[in-house]
């Protein structure tokens, strides 16, 4: 059985908590149901977002005071000083016993300094603290530019970090460079006069004629994502430099395709695997000079596989959704209510006893408080259902691996696609 990784050396002992969440990039639409639940249930919300629509949404849904952290930015002080103050104002309310939520645009752990500091300090002081996942600019970039980081690999790095630590750029993989419009900037002036230093580095590793893409994800409903294609030599032109600002990202596609190591391929390759379908899955290098502009039309192999759909029979091992309406409703509510989830974790039996409409097996499984029991009850093989096979309490209690079968299949598929 896997051992959970400890997120703190101190068991929370004090009233008050800190949750850090992300608002995503696209206004309001990227706010997750989980984050929305915390906005509605937290005593106080602090936010640092990049558009007025998201700010309005937070204020309309927060039950308590909603404070804009951008007031701590000032052109006369460093960003680091601003981040220290943002962190501290959140912690003061946590220390006063409040359940505090901090909302930062994008993913709250990506290019966000005060979020990590606040969580670390809160835990050291004995408070419960955690981070919720959010939609990052990188997620938007993958969608808008339509490339898969699992194919060929991907390196991401902040522009100043790339230069000052001489991080390697790999011409065989996808390279994503963040904050290229504020190279070497530590305050709020965002003067990009160090941008040519980055261009020198790109030209050294990729040459002046390699294509790069300037990217900025869409934010408010009226906006569209900015996707501009230049050569590295183009970046030296003043009119091109003026396109870049503090939120600009640069995507540098692979220049060459890395050769396959035949010895390693033989060791890793599954017996009998056909090369054709593997190559068909591998996406073309849309933005690269190596783009083979492959067609996704049906070749003989693909046509044969598609034709099998006409007589397809669902395999017996396929799992389908089960569970009473009461169980489905309870688990959906549990997933979208932080307060109910906390109460359930503290005493599953007490919460389950308040739920009407559950059958005895569902009550038993839910009182165990384990994910395996939920999968055992709600995801049943078609063969078991056809035979009207009843689950035993031991089967419910001892189910541990069911949720990972599908995930494993997806991971294996991704590996095959990357070959």
Swiss-Prot record:
Q: Which residues form a coiled coil?
A: none
Q: Which residues carry this modification: N-methylserine?
A: 408
BP term (GO), one: methylation
Please name the catalytic residues of this protein. 79, 83, 105
Keyword Nuclease assigned to the entry: answer is no
Entry's InterPro entries?
4pyrrol_Mease, 4pyrrol_Methylase_sf, 4pyrrole_Mease_sub1
The UniProt keywords, alphabetically, are: Methylation, Methyltransferase, S-adenosyl-L-methionine, Transferase
List every position bearing N-methylisoleucine.
411-412, 415-416
Does Transferase count among this protein's keywords? yes
Q: Which residues bind S-adenosyl-L-methionine?
A: 105, 107, 110, 137, 179, 217, 248-249
* Biological pathway: Secondary metabolite biosynthesis
According to the record's subunit comment, the protein's assembly and interactions are: Homodimer.
The record's domain comment reads: Within the homodimer, the clasp domain wraps around the adjacent subunit to position the core peptide into the other subunit's active site for iterative intermolecular methylation.
What name goes with this protein?
Methyltransferase/ribosomally synthesized type I borosin cyclic peptide precursor gjuMa
Which species is this UniProt entry from? Answer: Gymnopilus junonius (Spectacular rustgill mushroom)
Species lineage: Eukaryota, Fungi, Dikarya, Basidiomycota, Agaricomycotina
């Amino acid at each position: 059985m896997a051992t959970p990784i400890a997120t703190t050396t101190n068991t929370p002992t004090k009233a008050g908590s800190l949750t850090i969440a992300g608002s995503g990039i696209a206004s309001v639409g990227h706010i997750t149901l989980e984050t929305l639940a915390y906005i509605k249930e937290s005593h106080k919300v602090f936010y640092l977002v990049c558009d007025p629509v998201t700010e309005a949404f937070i204020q309309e849904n927060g039950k308590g005071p909603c404070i804009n952290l951008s007031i701590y930015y000032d052109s006369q002080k460093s960003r680091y000083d601003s981040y220290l103050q943002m962190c501290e104002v959140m912690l003061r309310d946590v220390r006063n016993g409040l359940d505090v939520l901090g909302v930062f645009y994008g993913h709250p752990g990506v290019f966000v300094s005060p979020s990590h500091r606040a969580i670390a300090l809160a835990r050291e002081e004995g408070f419960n603290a955690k981070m919720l996942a959010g939609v990052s600019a990188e997620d938007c970039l993958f969608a808008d530019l339509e490339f898969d980081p699992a194919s060929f690999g991907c390196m991401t790095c902040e522009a100043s970090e790339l230069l000052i630590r001489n991080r390697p750029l790999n011409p065989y993989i996808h390279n994503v460079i963040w904050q290229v419009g504020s190279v070497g900037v530590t305050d709020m002036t965002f003067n990009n006069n160090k941008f040519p230093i980055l261009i020198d580095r790109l030209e050294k590793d990729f040459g002046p004629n390699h294509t790069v893409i300037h990217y900025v994800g869409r934010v408010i409903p009226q906006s569209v994502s900015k996707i501009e294609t230049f050569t590295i030599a183009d970046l030296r032109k003043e009119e091109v430099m003026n396109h870049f600002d503090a939120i600009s990202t640069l995507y540098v596609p692979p220049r060459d395709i890395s050769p396959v190591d035949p010895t390693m391929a033989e060791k890793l390759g599954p017996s009998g695997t056909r090369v054709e379908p593997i190559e068909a899955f591998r996406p073309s290098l849309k933005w690269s000079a190596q783009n083979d502009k492959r067609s996704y039309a049906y070749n003989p192999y693909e046509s044969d596989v598609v034709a099998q759909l006409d007589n397809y029979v669902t395999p017996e091992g396929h799992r389908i959704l089960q569970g009473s309406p009461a169980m489905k409703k309870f688990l959906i509510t549990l997933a979208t209510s932080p307060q109910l989830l906390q109460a359930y974790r503290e005493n599953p039996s007490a919460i389950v006893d308040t739920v009407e409409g559950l059958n005895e097996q569902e009550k038993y499984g839910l009182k165990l408080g384990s994910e395996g029991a939920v999968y055992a009850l709600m995801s049943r093989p078609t063969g078991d259902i056809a035979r009207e096979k009843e689950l035993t309490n031991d089967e419910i209690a001892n189910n541990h691996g069911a949720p990972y079968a599908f995930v494993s299949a997806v991971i294996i598929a991704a590996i095959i696609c990357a070959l």
